[in-house]
């Protein structure tokens, strides 16, 4: 049956039994396809019936469907003609793991960061009103923890202020990555269905207000009494007191019930909340039984067991997790904060070991940062573990609430640099540029697991400024020993006997391994290279200017955007120190990258050992540091 669905129109003629059969097919399709490619399995298994109902009730793309935390949009993609592309999910030139405007007219926003959908919906509804398109509904699907983010409530406050047709579907599965926390999560759990409430209220309003002379006065009196009773007995007043209609809660796995609720909501032509209760991982036992994350996201897995087909090598996240626990055992002032991601950021083990020193604040990065400031003011040392891409959301709080007060807060930025398959929204290629403008900020970029542990310890010893440790997604690899350490900077390689000090190659973090390969390739061409790892990359260590002065060319290699990155900072430091040595930088161009593997993205932008070797050869030849012709040497490098 799924093969016959080319678009939402193909759903309209289906009976309830056919819809139930189709839902089963969709789940089996998702399980087998995502098992082969990796992706967000649990969230999509939970929204099958909901997505079917949405496309039967609303006319997409005439009525925009906006999925908050867009990893819930796989079923939406299937129902809008993209089922045949799922073998390429999250692969280069393949199907995106999130809504994508370039894929389909049914995808309105490239949504993947949480809590933004309601603001998009508010803006679209206003635009439709101003341009005379009053017959268009805007539907925002929120949930998977998104309502723990403050941006949702800012949007709700605005949406409720006008009578525009915005339908807000709360997909209440009680979770984001981990179980959703906080007062709002408790509030949703308390809600109960009140059949006929809105119909009776509307009929009563018309009848009482229709009374001559005293009608409006009587209505206001009755409304006040009703509001008082409702406040005492009915927990959905959080929504209704904002001026939002409320429908629910509805069994999110009963397609007929969800469809009926959505049709009811559509008829209001006003802002309305439809509360749908779903189960993350529905229909797949390994996901339902995964109490930690209900298979929120997975790699390639065995369908029968739900287990990964390959044993994962030690990763950066687990290395951080182990180190933090060790430091936490020695120091009771160390506390940890996550924004709804204890597992992905490596804090689950710390939570289990030190539950009273662990705080999950929900999807609320701004609050996390300022709460950390308060903890630091109280004499503790907070460690805020967060994906690099989500740091952008808390920049003002970092600047004004933490750095301005010179507070000892340590940021641990996971998934820094190019992450790959999750695409533009999840690459952490801005953090060095952002952190570089924060006064007093100190940033470390460990090259391996040993340095991660070491630099984390050094960060925890800082008591007069914020610090950050950044590392990428993936395997941590083997430790890379230093030849020597000079004033805090590790020297990883020096020119071989007989070669001059031609190039100082400054490697940022894990790019140290690539830099060593580049140095060896250049050595074979008679170019002497010194490879250094600054360890603490911001502010630029003063000793780097001394290293630079002893070489003919400085080259920086970093997993960050070139604008405002370490290359820019090193160049500025050389100018300030009046060291007149040319400086070239290798990094990421200032653009958004489509989804692909990390290696594919880096290759596309020329950040490979071969290409860097060719570039440096040309630069050295242009400086006259070697008599070899640049083109000739480049050919030999190939």
Swiss-Prot record:
Cofactor: Mg(2+); thiamine diphosphate
One GO cellular component, as annotated: cytosol
Coiled coil: none
InterPro entries the UniProt entry points to: Dxylulose-5-P_synthase, THDP-binding, Transketo_C/PFOR_II, Transketolase-like_Pyr-bd, Transketolase_BS, Transketolase_C, Transketolase_CS
Residues noted as binding thiamine diphosphate in the record, renumbered to the chain: 71, 112-114, 145-146, 173, 284, 365
Keywords: Isoprene biosynthesis, Magnesium, Metal-binding, Thiamine biosynthesis, Thiamine pyrophosphate, Transferase
Gene Ontology MF term list: 1-deoxy-D-xylulose-5-phosphate synthase activity; magnesium ion binding; thiamine pyrophosphate binding
Enzyme class, broadest EC rank: transferase
Catalytic activity: D-glyceraldehyde 3-phosphate + pyruvate + H(+) = 1-deoxy-D-xylulose 5-phosphate + CO2
Enzyme Commission code: 2.2.1.7
Family: Belongs to the transketolase family. DXPS subfamily.
Subunit structure and binding partners: Homodimer.
Name of this chain's protein: 1-deoxy-D-xylulose-5-phosphate synthase
Organism field: Mycobacterium sp. (strain KMS)
This protein's encoding gene: dxs
């Amino acid at each position: 049956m799924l093969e016959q669905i080319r678009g939402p129109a193909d759903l309209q003629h289906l009976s309830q039994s056919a819809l139930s059969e189709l839902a089963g097919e969709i789940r089996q399709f998702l399980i087998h396809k995502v098992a082969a490619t990796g992706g967000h399995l649990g969230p999509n298994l939970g929204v099958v019936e909901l997505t079917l109902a949405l496309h039967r009730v609303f006319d997409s793309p005439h009525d925009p469907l906006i999925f908050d935390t867009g990893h819930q949009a796989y079923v939406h993609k299937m129902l809008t003609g993209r089922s045949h592309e799922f073998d390429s999910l999250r692969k280069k030139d393949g199907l995106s793991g999130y809504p994508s405007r370039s894929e389909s007219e049914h995808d309105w926003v490239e949504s993947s960061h949480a809590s933004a959908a309601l603001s998009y919906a508010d803006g679209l509804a206003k635009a439709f009103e101003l341009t005379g398109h009053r017959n268009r509904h805007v539907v925002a699907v929120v949930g998977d923890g998104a309502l723990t983010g403050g941006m949702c409530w800012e949007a709700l406050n605005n949406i409720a202020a006008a009578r525009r047709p915005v339908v807000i579907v709360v997909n209440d599965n009680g979770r984001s990555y981990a179980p959703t926390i906080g007062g709002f999560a408790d509030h949703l759990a308390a809600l109960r269905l009140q059949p006929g409430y809105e119909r009776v209220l509307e009929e009563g309003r018309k009848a009482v207000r229709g009374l001559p002379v005293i009608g409006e006065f009587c209505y206001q009196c009755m409304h006040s009494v009703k509001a008082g009773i409702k406040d005492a007995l009915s927990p959905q007043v959080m929504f209704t007191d904002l001026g939002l209609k409320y429908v629910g809660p509805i069994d999110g796995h009963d397609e007929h019930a969800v469809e009926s609720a959505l049709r009811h909501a559509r008829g209001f032509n006003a802002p309305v909340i439809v509360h749908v209760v779903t189960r993350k991982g529905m229909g797949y036992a390994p996901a339902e039984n995964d109490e930690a994350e209900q298979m929120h996201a997975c790699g390639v897995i065995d369908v029968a067991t739900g287990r990964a087909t390959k044993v994962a090598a030690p990763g950066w996240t687990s290395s951080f997790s182990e180190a933090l626990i060790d430091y936490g055992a020695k120091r009771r002032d160390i506390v940890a904060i996550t924004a709804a991601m204890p597992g992905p950021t490596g804090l689950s083990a710390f939570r289990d070991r030190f539950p009273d020193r662990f705080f999950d604040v929900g999807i609320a990065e701004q609050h996390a940062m300022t709460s950390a400031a308060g903890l630091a003011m109280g004499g503790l040392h907070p460690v805020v573990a967060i994906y690099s891409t989500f740091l952008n959301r808390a920049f003002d709080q970092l600047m004004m609430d933490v750095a301005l007060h010179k507070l000892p807060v340590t940021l641990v930025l996971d998934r820094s640099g190019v992450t790959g398959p999750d695409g533009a929204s999840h690459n952490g290629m801005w953090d060095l540029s952002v952190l570089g403008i924060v006064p007093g900020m100190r940033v470390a970029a460990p090259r391996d697991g040993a340095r991660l542990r070491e630099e984390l310890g050094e960060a925890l010893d800082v008591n007069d400024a914020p610090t950050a440790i950044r590392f990428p997604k993936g395997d941590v690899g083997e430790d890379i020993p230093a030849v020597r350490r000079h004033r805090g900077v590790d020297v990883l390689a020096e020119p071989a006997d007989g070669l001059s000090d031609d190039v100082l190659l400054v490697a940022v973090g894990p790019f140290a391994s690539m830099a060593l390969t580049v140095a060896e390739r250049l050595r074979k061409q008679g170019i002497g290279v010194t490879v250094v790892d600054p360890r603490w990359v911001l502010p630029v260590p003063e000793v780097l200017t001394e290293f630079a002065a002893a070489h003919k060319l400085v080259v920086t290699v970093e997993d960050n955007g070139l604008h405002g990155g370490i290359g820019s900072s090193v160049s500025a430091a050389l100018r300030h120190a009046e060291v007149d040595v040319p400086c070239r930088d290798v990094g990421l161009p200032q653009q958004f990258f489509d989804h692909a593997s990390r290696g594919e993205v880096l290759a596309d932008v020329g950040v490979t050992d071969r290409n860097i070797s060719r570039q440096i050869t040309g630069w050295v030849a242009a400086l006259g540091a070697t008599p070899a012709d640049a083109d000739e040497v480049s050919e030999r490098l190939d």
